[in-house]
Amino acid sequence: MRAARTVEPSGPEGLRIEDVAAPAPGPDEIRVKVKATALNRADLLQTMGLYPAPPGAPPDIPGLEYAGEVAQVGANVTRWRVGDRVMGLVAGGAWAEELITHEREAIAIPFGLSFSEAA
């Protein structure tokens, strides 16, 4: 998959679009195909190395808000199915084609809302 990676903590100019390994969900997690994301102050601070990702979050892929479709579910997931439209907030990694989040951290996108509006 492709992701915007911080290769040099210098702001947006330190980002590169690169191929990275696709994440695999744990038993209580879902893999989301990201359809839209957002840009906020915390994202910019991450690209400058001033807002480090917490443990467990991708340290080099910024992005906090996302909207997309469930692409895979972990073995214990009961809340979501492949194809469900979800949105949410992650600790990092939303500037990628796919991300992993705990099933409890995703929210159903309300009917009539686009992916861009949801992100």
What are these regions (language model features)?
Residues M1-A4:
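Short structural boundary motif marking the start of a folded domain
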Residues T6-G14:
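Extracellular beta-rich ligand/substrate-recognition surface
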Residues G11, A21, F111-S114:
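General structural signal for secondary-structure boundaries
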Residues P12, L39-R41:
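Short, acidic Gly/Pro/Ser/Thr-rich loop/turn segments
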Residues A21-A38, L50-G93:
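Glycine-rich beta-strand-centered segment in the early N-terminal region that forms part
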Residues R41-M48:
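Cytochrome P450 core scaffold surrounding the K-helix E-X-X-R motif
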Residues L45, Q72, R79, R85-A119:
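NAD(P)H dinucleotide-binding glycine-rich loop of Rossmann-like/cofactor-binding domains
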